Amino acid sequence: MNHEYQIIAKSLSLTEKQVKDTIELLDEGFTIPFIARYRKERTGSLDEVQIAAISEQAEKMKELEKRKQTICKTIEAQEKLTPALKQKIEATWDAAELEDIYLPFKPKRRTKAQVARENGLEPLAQIILLQRERQPEQVANYYIKGNIKTAEEALSGAMDIIAEVISEDEIIRQKVRNVFKREAMITSKVVKSKQDEEEAQKFSDYFDFTEPLKRCCSHRLLAIRRGEKAGYLKVSIDVEEKQCTDQIQKKYIHGYGKCQQLVGEACIDAYKRLIKPSVETEFANSSKEAADKEAIHVFTENLRQLLLASPLGQKRVMAVDPGIRTGCKVVCLDEQGNLLHHSVIYTLGNKVQHDALADFRTLTQQYHIEAVAVGNGTASRETTDILRRLEGIPVYVVSEDGASIYSASENARKEFPQLDLTVRGAISIGRRLMDPLAELVKIDAKSIGVGQYQHDVNQTLLKQALDRTVESCVNQVGVNLNTASIHLLAYVSGLGMSLAKNIVEYRKEHGAFTSRNQLKHVSRLGDAASQQCAGFLRIPKAHNPLDNSAVHPERYPLVEAMAQEQHCAVSELIGSPDKLKKIELSRFVTSEVGMPTLNDILKELEKPGLDPRSQLEEFRFDERVHTIEDLSVGMELPGIVTNITNFGAFIDIGVHQDGLIHISQLADKFIKDPNEIVKLHEHVFVRVIEIDHKRQRIALSMRNQKK
């Protein structure tokens, strides 16, 4: 597999050893978070993104290897697999080139060329292709027999054979492919019979659209493909025909004459009928794959920022799911998110609002509420304005994305079988304020609403990427072994749903964990799983203080040696800058433990179990604006980032319609990625630059802001 290591290393700008060691660790069953955190010496301190890229490329290599074996078996069955051909196949690591090699041997439906061969026209095709015969029509007369009635039919059949030979020429296919790489244009046209339909207007920007394929960004390409799938657009990928046919004719035409003319016609036929449709499909697929990859990257970044959003922590919360006609669903939760109270409070009308405020105030006093969570759906702004009149209690607006999915789920029904799903939704909103990560892992990541075109991309790849992101975030934060739900534990490195259930069952039967060593008593949780999960599980007030840190149990002896050298207990070493400064890390370097791990341990001992998530901040919309009619160009307003795409960021400014900051308006400098400037749910200050009342669109800017 050495050659595969070289290819992966070169494509990712890594060393061959890094790739080899990482693949070995993955093959041994270690998870990406575990490898990134606890095997830095083996990988050369690769991060999770790099390890995931190696894993992805290694899987592609395995698939390519399987394809090679299938191709060799198929050609061998035809008794055409020569040693040279086998070596050529084995040396090829490009999927398109491999299929080009296989093309002449690939079983295919009965083609025009096969019919011509069955009619005995292959010798005539070879004569014409040699281009030495001056009178091919006369030679064609010798082939008039059976199904061939005229010399013209014989020549036509011979040209079909020549066209197929040309179309299976891997060098020619690569030349055409290179032209497409450089020059391909993507064109979309409206389907005339449907252009007046209301739904078609969503794609009006692409009714007559042309752009170089290599410059067509992912959101445009996905929008075009969505319009095509819906039946409103006709889409093609094309190049100037002459650029390709000239290259083909340059190789196959020698001199002048009737044979040369026939070969020239066969070249054009080969391109138009056989090569172009195949290469166009190939580029349609590869451009869609590239757009999917870019879009999935945007979705995973959005999800990561949602999962790692600032938690309120263990405080008593009143959560409100706003409603106008049906009233607000109100719940009160204790510090652990347990339900204390639920009711409905109506807020429509001045007198009702006065009564509602009194009801809200009573609940906050009765249940000692420390914070209020308001869902960001219908009537959110109006409800928030009422709740802000509560003295001394911060009010936070919380995204409702996915709350309705959770409230209707089997898990929610099991926990609250007697409650209406709207009440369950309000509970989810409150818990999301307390700990976004712990609550969001309960629902399918795709339900959270992570991107505009998430339903247009490859769903298998999207699920893999989102699941990997959830796993990464859960392990980055760490999990309280004694309070975590099954859903949260399931994403811990080495566990999964089955072992997570066993941990919860053990907790119910034996009470809280007091040591990581107790993991070995959990049913079916063996040494391998224990090794992978232990470092990511936290036990507050454990017998061993290291059990509430990210220090892995396999490194406890090392920390104990550090403490012994400082003449103190491990508990005295933790959080003591003076003692930690005195430790000479170089003295503890071994063949297995290098400076990367030692630095991580020291950092963890300084602040054990430090939550990497930022501090939660209260936010207020501008009191001057409540609807789009209140806006005017030039207004400067506070807002919250609600979604990030590769073309910009959507901002909630409190008018029931998000505004868009185009990527060109995000900064005073050129940027490639909006994530360089903004993060999901970040509080920003924006300027209104355009308002389209008819289409309900608001254009915003963050350029030229005063520092």
Residue ranges and their predicted role:
Residues 1-20, 27:
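Generic start-of-chain signal for non-secretory N-termini
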Residues 4, 62-80, 90, 405, ...:
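Long, highly charged, low-complexity intrinsically disordered interaction regions
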Residues 38-40, 129, 240, 322, ...:
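Short, ordered loop/turn segments at secondary-structure junctions
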Residues 178-185, 320-324, 377-382, 398-405, ...:
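A glycine-rich phosphate-binding loop feature that marks nucleotide/adenosyl-phosphate handling sites
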Residues 539-707:
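Single-stranded RNA-binding regions, centering on S1/OB-family and related RNA-binding modules
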